[in-house]
Regions:
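Short, acidic/polar
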Residues: 1-8, 49-64, 109-116
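N-terminal binding-site loop/beta-alpha segment at the start of enzyme catalytic domains
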Residues: 1-37
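Conserved, mostly hydrophobic/aromatic
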Residues: 8, 16, 29, 60, ...
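A structural motif
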Residues: 10-13, 66-69, 101, 123, ...
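Acidic (Asp/Glu)-rich catalytic clusters
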Residues: 29-38, 58-67, 117-121, 145-148
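A short, structured active-site edge motif that brings together acidic residues
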Residues: 36-48, 71-75
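Active-site groove signature of glycoside hydrolases
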Residues: 62-80, 210
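Beta/alpha (TIM)-barrel catalytic core signal, keyed to glycine-rich beta->alpha loops juxtaposed to Asp/Glu
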Residues: 77-212
Length: 212
């Protein structure tokens, strides 16, 4: 992991995405030392006790060896339907005022979720899925709406869970798009780029996103 982080830093990658739910990732990062990186971490799911979520965040800070993180995302978007969520969101803003968080945000999956957040909450950061085969947020205008409000956009799943880098072992779920994937591979081959380069360049060219 240390070598990976060194390689990332040497290539001007300065943001790390993690979560307490990602095994022991926060502990590993904390042991290596991540003072020179911007850290994005995520909340545990809200299951009735707001204080457990806040306590978990403080544990994340301790594990990471940080006094502040760049961003804290609500990991489970379904938490917004919880009766306690308004209390949690208020607590998150208190953490921001205390200087423990620079940006509050959400991890999302669908355009509808983004629309709901834009209509109901003020936030700084959002993580959204985006790739060659998933441009719903451009077509629906959500990316432009986020940009117009000054909300930082982080694109994830730019390789479609790795599918865009390896078409030889498609799961049953993705077999439905096998014909489209075959045409895509021909297009990529004709471009002279590798599968990785093509998928990465596609996302890099999207002006509304801030990071991938």
């Amino acid at each position: 992991v240390r070598n990976i982080l060194t390689l990332a830093k040497n290539n001007k990658i300065d943001t790390l995405d993690t979560a307490s739910g990602y095994g022991n990732s926060e502990e590993v990062l904390g042991e290596i030392g991540v003072d020179n990186y911007q850290i994005i971490t995520k909340t545990i799911s809200l299951e009735g006790d707001v204080n457990k979520v806040i306590d978990s965040f403080h544990k994340s800070l301790e594990s990471l060896g940080q006094k502040q993180v760049e961003g804290l995302l609500v990991h489970d978007i379904n938490n917004v339907e919880n009766k306690q969520f308004d209390i949690l969101f208020s607590k998150l803003n208190e953490l921001k005022q205390q200087g423990l968080i620079k940006k509050i945000g959400f991890s999302t999956y669908t355009p509808g979720q983004v629309n709901f957040l834009l209509e109901n909450f003020g936030f700084d950061l959002i993580q959204v899925p985006f790739n060659v085969f998933d441009t719903r947020l451009i077509q629906g205008g959500q990316l432009q709406a986020l940009k117009s409000k000054g909300i930082e956009v982080h694109a994830r799943s730019i390789f479609l869970q790795g599918v865009l880098l390896d078409f030889d072992n498609l799961s049953d779920y993705f077999l439905t798009w096998k014909k489209q994937f075959t045409k895509y591979q021909v297009m990529v081959e004709n471009s002279g780029l590798s599968l990785l380069e093509y998928a990465l360049n596609f996302s890099l060219k999207i002006q509304e996103k801030n990071k991938i």
